[in-house]
Amino acid sequence: KFDFASGEVTNDDNDWDIAFRGTSILVNGGSATGLAEEPARSGQGAAAIADGTFASVVSTGALTFSQDSASGPAIIPGSGNGWYNYAGAPTYLISPIPGKILVIRTRDGALAKLEILSYYKDAPSMPNAFSDQSQYYTFNYLYNPNKNSSSLE
């Protein structure tokens, strides 16, 4: 779990904004999706995916936010659906999709945007799904603590 306000990984049951479960990213808002060992939600978090570069996504604009639900996570999982592509044989790599920026409304109504850079430990420049540890997210993010703002600058 990650808390944007502190910029830290957290084990707190309430003070988290996003959680990682394999390639799925959960928000602290909505309801359980049915994934194994997912955290309880206590906030009003939601997510949207914007197309563009990290620098060019500057406002929530016309984005439509969704919360996690029994139908699935707000950030739709699966290769090509949300933030990543899965290569399959022979490399079996998980690679972030360029130009997909996740926009998060935090549990308390603030905003954040994040760009996932790597799914592998230490963000290797040439990842190897067989030798590099997976499920170690590396990302850039910007946090806007102003709850009445749509700015992502």
Over which residues does each language-model region extend?
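N-terminal "domain-start" segment
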Residues: K1-K100, D122-M126, D132-E153
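Short coil-to-beta-strand transition motifs
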Residues: V103-E115
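A mature extracytoplasmic/lumenal domain signature
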Residues: D108, S118-Y120, Y143
